[in-house]
Swiss-Prot record:
Annotated GO CC locations: cytosol
Full protein name: 2,3-bisphosphoglycerate-independent phosphoglycerate mutase
InterPro entries, alphabetized: Alkaline_phosphatase_core_sf (IPR017850), BPG-indep_PGM_N (IPR011258), Metalloenzyme (IPR006124), PGAM_B_sf (IPR036646), Pgm_bpd_ind (IPR005995)
Pfam families the record matches: iPGM_N (PF06415), Metalloenzyme (PF01676)
Length: 505
């Protein structure tokens, strides 16, 4: 088999397949390149949710899970399932790091602050984890304050009232809610420090909007026509901020959107905005957020090493690779694709155009796709063996719930893909086009009729362009992508990769 060069993986983040075309942005968009690829290239579908990507049954996938499985070439048991099981079997309540945190805060005479996503979306956090952690801390004689991060992005846009009410009803004596904060502020990942500062002020200083109780905080937000994701950081009556000796436990099990607020709270060298660092007795994370965070935090569930990822294995063969995505998805094609390893592999180059500085991406659905494409076309001619690129638009604009904007997002990506195909035709390269999960193919909630902003469990495409003559592709899972790329590169699989190539010759 001829070895094409480069071999390319293009990830259309959030571009799923849905037979219902009524709110299906990829179908409603003008996408001549994707239409051509579907019509002329071998294609099939991939499953991106549940046990096929290491998640509980029925749990939708997400970009972290997707890129981790893609890079690993095997099904990777994800943190959500691990933590759920620990709560179920009771080992959660015996977790050494959590017990150390509780003992340290108690010895300092402090309060245990718990930062928790209050939804059952299961992408960054889960309300059940928060309820379990409250139970654990109260059982050790600690006063507990919950900082409720409202979602509205991985669940319905106006579901926080029910989730917050359920959390309040479950709180034992000694536990209360101190703040209610939309994830737009508490979980930024694009260095928009003006947002993070508002969340910091509410949590740490007790400054912000005010409400008499947590449910009222959500209700008054709705009265102002502000949905869950965007709830202004709101301080509940009686909460006065962090005090010396207090401790913070962040329950996010996905790293990217927890990093900024935690740097503001815990890093000595933080310079995102002027602040006086709180004097905490303990700072605990559900998982490891980065090596920098590990300098000032402990971890309840340390990461497990994923040996011989796609990037590591390509590097071991003495081959070169390039990773490309705008800011919003850059960690996914680097950190997550490399199995949680931040440093590039030998022979791995990277480029990250900045995502546009807009409040929400429906205001600029093209995002930075043009810059991504310009660099993409350039590096196709540079002699790399493997190129991995992520187009963020379908997912990031899909999360806004704006169908017309999502259509524009798909069209912007399709234009870029057209230039990429032309560049590959010139050099004789091959490409797999896939998505890591669905999103923008369902922009209206079929139950409520309102905007649908979450990921889906729909199948996603896999298309082979420039592959071997007569090749076909079959349905599979994300763990099969790396073995497929390695087959195209004529590189043997490492023994750890249990995925199977999607190509039938």
């Amino acid at each position: 088999m001829r070895t094409p060069k480069p071999v390319v993986l293009t990830i259309l983040d959030g571009w799923g397949l849905n037979e219902d075309t009524s709110s299906n942005a990829p179908v409603l968009a003008n996408t001549p390149t994707m239409d051509r690829l579907f019509a002329t290239c071998p294609n099939a579908t991939l499953t991106t949710f549940g046990p096929n990507v290491g998640l509980p049954t029925g749990q939708m996938g997400n970009s972290e899970v997707g890129h981790t499985n893609i890079g690993a070439g095997r099904i990777v048991a994800m943190d959500l399932g691990q933590i759920d099981l620990a709560i179920e079997d009771g080992s959660f309540f015996r977790n050494a790091a959590m017990l150390d945190f509780a003992a340290t805060v108690k010895a300092a005479g402090g309060v245990a602050h718990l930062m928790c996503v209050v939804s059952d979306g299961g992408v960054h956090g889960h309300i059940l984890h928060g309820q379990a952690a409250v139970k654990l801390m109260v059982s050790h004689g600690l006063k507990v304050v919950v900082h409720a991060i409202t979602d509205g992005r991985d669940v319905a846009p106006q579901s926080a009232e029910d989730f917050v009410a359920a959390l309040v009803a479950s709180l034992p004596q000694g536990a209360s809610i101190g703040t209610v904060i939309g994830r737009y502020y508490a979980m930024d990942r694009d260095n928009r420090w003006e947002r993070v500062e508002k969340a910091y002020d509410a949590m740490v200083l007790g400054k912000g909007e005010h409400a008499r109780d947590a449910v009222s905080a959500v209700a008054q937000s709705y009265a102002n026509k502000v949905t869950d994701e965007f709830i202004l950081p709101t301080v509940i009556d009686g909460y006065e901020g962090f005090k010396a000796g207090d401790g913070l436990f962040c329950l996010n099990f996905r790293a990217d959107r927890a990093r900024e607020i935690l740097l503001a709270i815990g890093a000595d060298d933080f310079d995102g905005f002027a602040r006086e660092k709180p004097v905490l007795s303990a700072l605990l994370g559900m998982v490891e957020y980065s090596t920098r965070h590990s300098d000032f935090m402990t971890t309840a569930y340390p990461k497990r090493d994923i040996v011989n990822t796609l990037g590591a294995w390509v590097a071991k063969q003495g081959l070169t690779q390039f990773r490309l995505a705008e800011t919003e998805k850059y960690p996914h094609v680097t950190f997550f694709l490399n199995g949680g390893k931040e440093e590039p592999e030998v022979g791995e180059d990277r480029f990250m155009p900045k995502s546009p500085k807009v409040a929400t991406y429906d205001l600029q659905p093209e995002m930075s796709a043009a810059e991504v494409t310009e660099k993409f076309v350039e590096v196709i001619g540079k002699g790399y063996d493997l190129i991995v690129t992520n187009y963020a638009n379908p997912d990031m604009v899909g999360h806004t719930g704006d169908l017309q904007a999502a259509i524009k997002a798909c069209e912007a990506v399709d234009r870029g893909l057209g230039a990429v195909v032309a560049a590959l035709e010139k050099v004789g390269g091959a490409m797999l086009v896939i998505a890591d999960h669905g999103n923008c193919e369902t922009m209206v909630d079929p139950v409520t009729g309102g905007p649908h902003t979450a990921h889906t469990t729909n199948p996603v495409p896999v298309i082979l362009f420039g592959g071997p003559e007569g090749a076909k592709v079959h349905d599979g899972i994300l763990a099969d992508v790396a073995p497929t790329l390695l087959q195209l590169m004529n590189v043997p699989l490492p023994p750890e990769m249990t995925g199977k190539s999607l190509i039938d010759l």
